Amino acid sequence: MRLTAIDELVDLAPYEGLIERWLERELADNPLLLAVDRDPDVRRWYVRLRGEQRDFTTIWLTLGQRTLRYETYFMPAPEEQHEAVYEYLLRRNHRLFGMRFSIGDEDAVYLVGQMPLSAVDEVELDRVVGSTYAYVEQYFRPALALGFASRLGA
């Protein structure tokens, strides 16, 4: 087994090309995929999907020296029933594959995950984007109903 030194830089060009090509094909073929954009300064892609339970889901794919990170903004910080919301989401974490619910700096909820570069291929990109979409569609409404019950009249 070859160990890579922490300061040894990995050539990211092949991964960038793979992600670019996959996203271009998906944008052409997948009617749920509305937009793809890229920030080349930080090797980050923005993927916007049309949803049913939530109007839009935006996924950020960030290519780093060791991992591909992916995340989506799930919902704002709950206004009420904080414990119930966080318990609901933590219990869902047990069922998720390759992702987890996380609380951001501003207390908003995110779905986040990462994979080693060695795992990045078209099948995994499809799994990441598809799973993110499915998890948002499945868990968004119940979490929102708990955290914003008064506002939603629930």
Residue ranges, per PLM feature:
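Intrinsically disordered or highly flexible coil/loop and linker segments, enriched in small
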Residues: 32, 141-145
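Short, internal acidic amphipathic alpha-helical interface segments
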Residues: 69-110
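The feature represents the first ordered module of a protein
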Residues: 49-83
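A short, solvent-exposed beta-edge/loop patch
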Residues: 102-134
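Charge-rich, low-complexity N-terminal segments
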Residues: 1-56, 104
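Short, highly charged C-terminal tails/helix-capping segments
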Residues: 144-154
